[in-house]
Amino acid sequence: MKFFLLFLVVLPIMGVLGKKNGFAVDSNGKAPECFFDHYCNSECTKVYYAEKGYCCTLSCYCVGLDDDKKVLDISDTRKKLCDFTLFN
């Protein structure tokens, strides 16, 4: 019973503190364009406060963005490609 109550308390907190991945956008709704990973890592960590970033399909893909950051709406195929590239 104690485990169940603990689970009910921790589950909402995990949802609030979650991070997301995606192409972070500026105030104009555009993601930074890129050719090299080091540019994206700098852009994502310093401008958008993500954990890291890299170049995927000529746009900066940020990993570990806060939930309140806006990301570019993309197809599931493109997102899967960038997530797959990240983990391989």
Swiss-Prot record:
GO MF annotation: an example: sodium channel regulator activity
GO CC terms of this entry: extracellular region
InterPro entries: LCN-type_CS_alpha_beta_dom, Scorpion_toxin-like_sf
Chief localization: secreted
Protein name: Beta-insect excitatory toxin LqhIT1d
Disulfides per UniProt: 34-55, 40-60, 44-62, 56-82
Note on domains (UniProt): Has the structural arrangement of an alpha-helix connected to antiparallel beta-sheets by disulfide bonds (CS-alpha/beta).
Record's subcellular location: Secreted
Tissues showing expression: Expressed by the venom gland.
Record function comment: Excitatory insect toxins induce a spastic paralysis. They bind voltage-independently at site-4 of sodium channels (Nav) and shift the voltage of activation toward more negative potentials thereby affecting sodium channel activation and promoting spontaneous and repetitive firing.
Keywords: Disulfide bond, Ion channel impairing toxin, Neurotoxin, Secreted, Signal, Toxin, Voltage-gated sodium channel impairing toxin
Secretion signal span: 1-18
Recorded family membership: Belongs to the long (4 C-C) scorpion toxin superfamily. Sodium channel inhibitor family. Beta subfamily.
Domain LCN-type CS-alpha/beta: 20-83
Secreted keyword on record: yes
Organism whose genome encodes this protein: Leiurus hebraeus
